[in-house]
Amino acid sequence: TLYSSAQINGVLKETGQEKRLQIVPETDLSGHGTHVAGIIGATNNNGKGVSSIAGGTGNNDGVRLMTCQIFEGSMSASDSQNAAAYIYAADNGACIAQCSYGNSYAITEDDMYINGGEFKIDGKDVKLDGSPLENAALRYFLDPANSNHPSLEGNIAVFAAGNHSQPYSSYPGALPYVISVTAFGADYLPGGYTNYGPGCKIAAPGGEYFDADNYGMMILSTGVSNAAQSSPGIGGDRNYVYMQGTSMACPHVSGVVALGISYAKKLGKKFSRDEFQSLLLTSVNELDGHFTGTKDYYDLSSYSWTKLDLSRYQGKMGTGAVDAWKFLMAIEGTPTIMTQAGKKMCIDISRYCNPHDEYTITVDAATKTALG
């Protein structure tokens, strides 16, 4: 069911849960949001800090960020706070919802997330309130009638899959109409923390803690110098800090989505949300071939080393690792085929041609000689 912002706001008022978004002089207490924002939109090539996915050069050629703060320094938000953020974003021009958060409960079905109820979770009786307002507001944000970009019929929502090592995506990311992002480390293997399995759509770099002397395996991005965070900086500079998680993987994908939307506009193309997301999810690099044997992982929740059976991740990290270049080529309409340098490859061109059309291929003399 799709709702209007007036209907959703009406429910908020009737239930006494109305929460108006407002700009307040409050610091990003954890640095989490600032770190995520830097991955997407830090200015590139200025000799400072880090480069980002879609930040541009500082000449009005990069992504624009809208901040909708829902946590207020805590690690949770109410159903109404989340709903208000999506309505505000949709009504004020946002075309991508970058959502590095999710529900920590073992929710495995859409109805559990939306309507709540009483469930048996991990052997315990748990009562969940559900998130009907958030779901309705998210659908409002995604409604093609509320699209905020000329190259898209419907906005895009990207979520972190979750950091609980669970064999399914957390919600709202597991919903079928959004993108849930898993995380891999610098070794191209799953981060030991990442969720995986049903609901997960695509993977991206999320970093991984190795030891106290080697933070470089994590993701470096913008920080808040006076934030109450434990993340390490560079040489004491906490304006740039290391973090790990699907929260860091998520903005890599959101940044690539932003590049794709911008490129589609440049080419004068328009896509439905389903078409656009399909191009994204098929423009990937294969991961499963790496998932053999075991991996040593340092669990920050128990402060101990453990071994991961990598086979359990096969086919469960999403379609593959996000690839910005492949995605932009797909938007352009240019097929991409990866091959090893110095190796020969046979390509079945029937996969790329209409069998009812005629094609003429001209090969110059130099190419003929090279081909033998």
For the regions a protein language model found, what residue spans apply to each?
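Catalytic-core segments of hydrolase enzymes
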Residues: 36, 95-223, 281-284
